[in-house]
Structure formats: structure tokens, C-alpha cells
Design a protein with these regions (language model features):
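Alpha-helical transmembrane segments of multi-pass small-molecule/ion transporters
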Residues: 1-312
Length: 312
């Protein structure tokens, strides 16, 4: 229990930044879209490039985004089928995308910075490409109930600058050219600012929730997919690799686990508003999942480190 409390204590500063973002959005009218644009189009690509350019790249890492994409797609369609039986309306779509979509960027990257050696954060970012691809394809399609074609979804994906930052980082990495000290110094500034801006964006987004909705059955089913089934699939694949495949080492296993234990993605609220997909229920569920993660993440990591992880 002491270990769980210690891990929870380490998360408190991140949640303090969320609270600051909430205050800024609620009382000072800070625009989350402006913060989001700053994070997505300027800070995140620079941070991403730096990490990927400096990581020790291995060909086997190419499989990571594919594996993660397959995992979350599997959960999404299982929960979509279950949602159609329970609800039979658009709530099934919302439950499916909420169960599969995690806040792997704004929340997950600061968490990775806290839990991983710095040289492995680039691998986390590379693996997270699977989440970006899922968002631009399956998530868009289900959120819009078929409104976007595959071509339109891919065009939306092509507009996401992090894709190009990863590609540029891989190319620079393979060139064997090291980053100059002065570049690394300023890149460190961007890395710190991303943690602050990213967590505050979550708070600013939650500040715009006009009415909280408490739907116990919907929340329970969504949480079962997000906080139980998805990590369970991850653990199954990790144990398969540990016992038979031996493709990845312990840090990669931990990265795949971290990707599955973060709260529901904040972008779900934006999709719900745009598509008229019960936006208040979506925003409320995101808030509940973010609060719940303060307990679930330390507990999940404790179980992982003590019963699943193999010390290298």
C-alpha cells in the first residue's frame, strides 16, 4: 500500500497542473483551443522530434504502433457490439470510442517522462502513432457514424504535424548525426513546457463542461473497457512476448502497458460536440476517468511491477 501511495503522490503535481488549467479556463476565459493549437502544432512536434532523434532505434519498433492500433481497435469493436445490445443508439458509439481512446499525449507523455528513463520516451512516442492512426480512422468513423470516408480520415491524419516530426526524427536518427548541445538545451525548454501546457489543456477543456451527467451504467461499462479490458489485453501480449516471442525488452513492455492505463482521451469531448454525440455525457465521463486514474494508475503500476514485469 505504501508503494501505491508513493506512486499516487508522484501524480499529484500533474493533477495540480490540471487544476490550474481548470481555473484558467473557468475564471480567466483561457481558450483551450488556443492552448491546444500551441501544443499540437508547435510544442509537441519539437518535443517529439527531439526524443525520436535521440532514441536508440531498432527495426522491431516498427511493429509497436501496429500492435497498439490492433489492441485499441479490438476493444473498440467489442464494446461497440456490447453497446448496441445495451443501448441500441448513439451511446453505443460513444461508449466504444471512449473505452478505446486514451489520453496518451497530454496525460501519457508526462506520465512516460515520470516513469521511463529519458532514452525510452522516444520509443513511447513512436508506439503512440498507433493511437493517432486509430483517432484518424476508426474513431472518426464511429464518432461521425460513418460521416467520414476512409480518404477523408487519412487526409485529417496527414494534417497532424506529429506524424512528420516522428518521420523527421527517425531520418535524423538513422543519419547518425548527433544534436548540438545548444539545440538540446533549448529542446529541454520545450520538453518542460509541453508537460505544463499539456496538463493545463485537460483542465481548460474540463472547465467548459456546463452540466455534469452521472450515468452509472454507461460509466461502469466504459471504465470496464478502458481500465480493465485494454490493460488486460496488453498484459496478455506482454506475457506472450516474455514466454515465447522474445521480440522486445522490459522497457518496451512497460511502454505498452503505460499506453493502456491512461484516462479517456480529452479529444473525445471535442468529437462529441462536433458530431452531436451526447457531448455532456462525454465530457462528464472524461472528468470521472481523469479523477479515477489518480487511483487506478498507481494500483495498476504496482500490480505490473510486482507480478508481470521481468527485471532485465
Amino acid at each position: 500500500m505504501d508503494v501505491v501511495l508513493t506512486l499516487a503522490g508522484n501524480l499529484v503535481p500533474l493533477y495540480a497542473l490540471i487544476v490550474l488549467g481548470y481555473i484558467a479556463g473557468k475564471f480567466f476565459n483561457v481558450d483551450r483551443q488556443t492552448l491546444g493549437a500551441l501544443g499540437i502544432y508547435i510544442i509537441m512536434p519539437i518535443v517529439t522530434f527531439g526524443y525520436v532523434a535521440q532514441m536508440e532505434f531498432r527495426p522491431s519498433y516498427i511493429a509497436l504502433p501496429v500492435v497498439f492500433y490492433a489492441m485499441i481497435t479490438c476493444v473498440c469493436f467489442i464494446w461497440l457490439a456490447a453497446g448496441k445490445k445495451v443501448y441500441g443508439d448513439s451511446r453505443a458509439n460513444l461508449m466504444a470510442i471512449s473505452s478505446a481512446s486514451g489520453n496518451t499525449g497530454y496525460f501519457g507523455l508526462p506520465l512516460a517522462l515520470m516513469l521511463l528513463p529519458e532514452e525510452w520516451v522516444g520509443v513511447y512516442i513512436f508506439a503512440n502513432l498507433g493511437a493517432l492512426l486509430f483517432e484518424a480512422t476508426i474513431l472518426y468513423y464511429l464518432a461521425a457514424r460513418g460521416r467520414f470516408s476512409v480518404r477523408e480520415s487519412l487526409i485529417k491524419l496527414a494534417r497532424f504535424p506529429t506524424i512528420y516530426a516522428v518521420a523527421a526524427g527517425v531520418a535524423y536518427n538513422l543519419s547518425g548525426t548527433g544534436m548540438a548541445d545548444v539545440v538540446v538545451t533549448y529542446w529541454e525548454y520545450f520538453k518542460g513546457s509541453y508537460v505544463v501546457i499539456g496538463m493545463m489543456i485537460i483542465g481548460a477543456a474540463l472547465a467548459k463542461v456546463k452540466r455534469m451527467v452521472w450515468a452509472p451504467r454507461f460509466i461502469s461499462l466504459t471504465f470496464a473497457g478502458k481500465f480493465f479490458m485494454l490493460p488486460l489485453i496488453s498484459v496478455g501480449l506482454i506475457m506472450l512476448d516474455q514466454s515465447a516471442l522474445h521480440l522486445f525488452d522490459a522497457q518496451v513492455h512497460k511502454i505498452m502497458f503505460i499506453l493502456t492505463i491512461v484516462p479517456i482521451g480529452a479529444n473525445i469531448a471535442a468529437f462529441a460536440v462536433e458530431m452531436d454525440l451526447k457531448p455532456e455525457k462525454a465530457a462528464s465521463t472524461i472528468l470521472y476517468s481523469t479523477v479515477f486514474a489518480l487511483i487506478s494508475i498507481p494500483f495498476s503500476l504496482y500490480l505490473y511491477e510486482n507480478f508481470i514485469a521481468i527485471t532485465p
